[in-house]
Swiss-Prot record:
<keyword id="KW-0699">rRNA-binding</keyword>
<keyword id="KW-0694">RNA-binding</keyword>
<keyword id="KW-0689">Ribosomal protein</keyword>
<comment type="similarity">
    <text>Belongs to the universal ribosomal protein uL1 family.</text>
</comment>
<dbReference type="GO" id="GO:0006412">
    <property type="term" value="P:translation"/>
</dbReference>
<dbReference type="InterPro" id="IPR016095">
    <property type="entry name" value="Ribosomal_uL1_3-a/b-sand"/>
</dbReference>
<dbReference type="InterPro" id="IPR023674">
    <property type="entry name" value="Ribosomal_uL1-like"/>
</dbReference>
<dbReference type="InterPro" id="IPR023673">
    <property type="entry name" value="Ribosomal_uL1_CS"/>
</dbReference>
<dbReference type="GO" id="GO:0003735">
    <property type="term" value="F:structural constituent of ribosome"/>
</dbReference>
<dbReference type="InterPro" id="IPR005878">
    <property type="entry name" value="Ribosom_uL1_bac-type"/>
</dbReference>
<dbReference type="GO" id="GO:0006417">
    <property type="term" value="P:regulation of translation"/>
</dbReference>
<dbReference type="GO" id="GO:0022625">
    <property type="term" value="C:cytosolic large ribosomal subunit"/>
</dbReference>
<keyword id="KW-0810">Translation regulation</keyword>
<dbReference type="InterPro" id="IPR028364">
    <property type="entry name" value="Ribosomal_uL1/biogenesis"/>
</dbReference>
<keyword id="KW-0820">tRNA-binding</keyword>
<dbReference type="InterPro" id="IPR002143">
    <property type="entry name" value="Ribosomal_uL1"/>
</dbReference>
<dbReference type="GO" id="GO:0019843">
    <property type="term" value="F:rRNA binding"/>
</dbReference>
Length: 232
């Protein structure tokens, strides 16, 4: 089905301004999903924040209970010893210090997540211009600077997603694949929303979770009725 036909199919199925129960919203998306690859299911959450204010920017990470459906390659900066061994045991593809930094500077950047122990940041700091633009720079706010690298690796590989408000105060995140069953997608979305609520800035006023929309990789969004979700 051509993308234009897919968009039209969803547009016909969706009533303007209507919010759908989660299961109905997902059904609409899956019915119109005809791509030759397994599409992702994405969510856009409009928050009641002023993203222009530094104290109202929302950033963090969530471990999705049903995972993301993606294979994640992890590199860890940790000094030789217990912490490095812990990271390797958890499944990290690469662990090191200056040697790992040199490999990255030489072009080895085939990683989805880069983690560092606090005492390794002196090495990682030199890679800011390399890792920063790729979204790979370790940051304590999203759990990628950690004194427990083994746990951080396990989280990354078991379905951890990072989120950050854009200029419009919207969070964009993937909550799984179209091949996931509805309950898995729902549990992932609920986990994300609960963590967003926990991360609510103290200065945010009014309705915080203003709008939740789900979409497939190639399709438009369908608004979700939040009362169909368990957010307590």
């Amino acid at each position: 089905m051509a993308q234009s036909k897919r968009v039209k199919a969803i547009a016909v199925a969706v009533a303007p301004g209507k919010a759908y129960a989660f299961e109905d919203a997902i059904k609409i998306l899956k019915t119109a999903t005809k791509a030759k690859f397994v599409e992702s299911i994405d969510v856009a959450v409009r928050l009641g924040v002023d993203a222009k204010k530094s104290d109202q920017q929302v950033r963090g990470s969530t471990v999705l209970p049903a995972g993301t459906g993606k294979s994640v390659r992890v590199a860890v900066f940790a000094p030789a010893g217990a912490k490095a061994d812990e990271a390797l045991a958890a499944g990290a593809e690469a662990v090191g210090m200056d040697d790992l930094a040199e490999k990255m500077q030489a072009g080895d950047l085939s990683y989805d997540v880069v983690i560092a122990t606090p005492d390794a940041m002196r090495v990682v700091g030199k890679l800011g211009t390399l890792l920063g633009p790729r979204g790979l720079m370790p940051n304590p706010k999203v759990g990628t600077v950690s004194a427990n690298p083994g746990e951080a690796v396990k989280n990354a590989k078991s379905g951890q997603v990072r989120y950050r408000t854009d200029k419009a105060g919207i969070i964009h995140c993937t909550i799984g694949k179209a091949s996931f069953d509805d309950e898995a997608l729902k549990s992932n979305l609920q986990a994300l929303l609960l963590d967003l609520v926990k991360a609510k800035p103290a200065t945010s006023k009014g309705t915080y979770l203003q709008k939740v929309s789900v979409s497939s990789t190639m399709g438009p969004g369908v608004t979700v009725d939040q009362s169909s979700l368990s957010l307590k």
